[in-house]
A protein has these predicted regions:
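Hydrophobic core segments of alpha-helical transmembrane domains in multi-pass membrane transport
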Residues: 64-76, 105, 180-185, 230-240, ...
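Interfacial loop-to-helix junctions that mark the boundaries of transmembrane helices
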Residues: 53-61, 85-91, 137-142, 214-229, ...
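Helix-loop-helix "hairpin" substructures at the membrane interface of multi-pass membrane proteins
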Residues: 138-148, 152-158, 219-297
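Alpha-helical transmembrane segments within multi-pass membrane transporters and channels
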Residues: 137-177, 332-333
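Transmembrane helix-bundle core of multi-pass membrane transporters
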Residues: 170-245, 271-274, 294-302, 377-380
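Cytosolic-side transmembrane-helix boundaries in multi-pass membrane proteins
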Residues: 2-73, 77, 256, 263-270, ...
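Single transmembrane alpha-helix segments in multi-pass membrane proteins
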Residues: 71-136, 160-167, 313-328, 360
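Transmembrane alpha-helical segments in multi-pass inner-membrane proteins
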Residues: 283-284, 293-359
Length: 380
C-alpha cells in the first residue's frame, strides 16, 4: 500500500528541488493541520513555459551556429567546388584535428581555467610514443601505452600545481608550455640526433595502430578520416557528461564560483585536476593521430595550436571567465575553423588573409555570444 492511502507522510520535492515530508489527508506526522501550499513563483512559471525562441536564445552555441551558416554561404558562392562531398570531407578532417582538442579545452574553460600547454602536449605525446617504441624495439602499442601514462601525468601535474599553489592557470600552463617546448626539442636531438623522430612504419603493431588513429573510411564513395569519428564521439561523450551527470554540474559550479561550489560540497580540487587530465587525454589521441599519419614526428610542431583550440572554444560560446559554454559549441567552433582554412584554398584567395578572418570570427562570435547571453538572462 502506498503512503498516500495509509496516511503516512510522503516525501516530494519542494520548490528548491530537495525532498521534504508533506502530508496526505491524514495530517502531518505531528498532528498539526497541513498548511496551504505556497503559490509557485512567477519566474518559475516563465521558465516552465518558456517559448521555443527563448530556449533557443539561451543556448551557448547559438552565435557559432549563425557564424558557421554565414561562412558556409560565403564559400558556397565564392568557391565552386566547396559543397562537393570530397571538399566537405576535407573540411571535416581539418575540423576534426582541431575539434578533438577543442572539446576538452572547452570543458576546461567552462570550469574556469585554460591550458597554454595543450598544443605542445600533443607533440610530446607523439614523441614519447615514437621514441619509446623505436629505442626499445617494442610493439608500437606499448609505446602508445607509455605515452598515455606520461601525457595524463603531465595533465594531472598542471592541475595539481594549480590547485596547490593558487597560481593563475595562465602562469602554470605557460611554464609547462615552455618546459615541454624545450624538452621536445632537446630530447629528440639527444636521442635521435635530429629534430625529428625515426620512422616506425615497419615496426610491430603499426598497421593496427594506424587503423585506429589514422585510417580512412569510405562512405558512399567518399573518403573520411577516422579522426572525424573520434571527434564526434568526444562531442557526444562530453555533452552527456555536462548535461546528464553530476560531474557536469560540478564543472559548471566550479567555473561559476569556486568558493560557493566548495561550500555546498563540490570537490573543487578533484574536478579541476580531472579537467586538466581530460585535456591530456585529448592531446594523447591527437598525438597518436599525428604519429601514425606520418610515421615520424617533428619536435617543433604544435607551438601556437593551443590558441586555435581556445579560439574554437570561445567561438563556440565558452566564456573566458568560466561557468558557461557547451561541447557542441566547441565542435561548431572547430567546424568554423575548418571551413575557413579550407574555404580560402578552394576559393583561391591569398592564404595570408586566413589569420585576419580567424581574428574577425573570434571578435564577432564573442560579441554575438555576449549579446545572446544578455538576452537569455533578461528573458529569465
Amino acid at each position: 500500500m502506498s503512503a498516500a492511502t495509509d496516511g503516512t507522510p510522503d516525501a516530494t520535492p519542494d520548490a528548491t528541488g530537495g525532498g521534504r515530508p508533506v502530508t496526505t489527508p491524514g495530517g502531518r506526522p505531528d498532528g498539526d493541520p497541513a498548511p496551504a501550499a505556497a503559490p509557485r513563483a512567477s519566474a518559475d512559471e516563465r521558465i516552465l513555459h518558456a517559448s521555443p525562441l527563448r530556449k533557443l536564445l539561451s543556448r551557448p552555441e547559438l552565435g557559432s551556429v549563425v557564424g558557421a551558416l554565414a561562412v558556409l554561404l560565403v564559400f558556397a558562392f565564392a568557391a565552386d567546388g566547396f559543397l562537393r562531398a570530397s571538399s566537405l570531407s576535407t573540411v571535416l578532417y581539418a575540423s576534426s584535428t582541431i575539434g578533438i582538442m577543442a572539446v576538452p579545452v572547452a570543458l576546461l574553460m567552462i570550469g574556469g581555467e585554460f591550458d597554454l600547454s595543450a598544443g605542445v602536449l600533443v607533440t610530446s605525446s607523439a614523441l614519447v610514443s615514437s621514441m619509446f617504441s623505436y629505442q626499445m624495439t617494442a610493439n608500437v602499442w606499448v609505446g602508445a601505452g607509455v605515452s598515455l601514462l606520461v601525457t595524463l601525468a603531465i595533465g594531472a601535474f598542471n592541475g595539481f600545481v594549480l590547485t596547490r599553489t593558487g597560481l593563475p592557470s595562465f602562469i602554470v600552463t605557460l611554464g609547462t608550455f615552455l618546459m615541454l617546448t624545450g624538452m621536445n626539442l632537446g630530447f629528440t636531438k639527444l636521442i635521435d640526433g635530429t629534430v625529428s623522430t625515426k620512422t616506425i612504419a615497419d615496426m610491430e603493431g603499426f598497421p593496427s595502430a594506424h587503423a585506429v588513429f589514422a585510417s580512412t573510411l569510405t562512405v558512399g564513395g567518399v573518403d573520411f578520416k577516422i579522426t572525424i569519428v573520434w571527434w564526434l564521439g568526444l562531442v557526444a561523450l562530453a555533452s552527456w557528461v555536462l548535461l546528464r551527470t553530476r560531474t557536469g554540474n560540478w564543472i559548471f559550479a566550479v567555473g561559476g564560483n569556486k568558493d560557493a561550489a566548495r561550500a555546498v560540497g563540490v570537490p573543487v580540487t578533484r574536478t579541476r585536476i580531472g579537467l586538466y587530465t581530460g585535456v591530456a587525454l585529448g592531446a594523447w589521441i591527437s598525438g597518436q593521430h599525428l604519429l601514425f599519419s606520418y610515421d615520424a614526428v617533428q619536435s617543433g610542431e604544435g607551438v601556437g595550436n593551443e590558441l586555435i583550440y581556445i579560439i574554437a572554444a570561445v567561438i563556440g560560446g565558452c566564456l573566458i571567465t568560466g561557468g558557461y559554454g557547451s561541447a557542441v559549441g566547441s565542435a561548431v567552433g572547430a567546424l568554423l575553423f575548418g571551413m575557413t582554412s579550407k574555404g580560402i584554398v578552394f576559393a583561391e584567395w591569398n592564404p595570408d588573409w586566413f589569420k585576419f578572418f580567424l581574428g574577425a570570427m573570434l571578435l564577432l562570435a564573442t560579441l554575438l555570444n555576449a549579446w545572446v547571453r544578455k538576452r537569455a538572462e533578461a528573458a529569465k
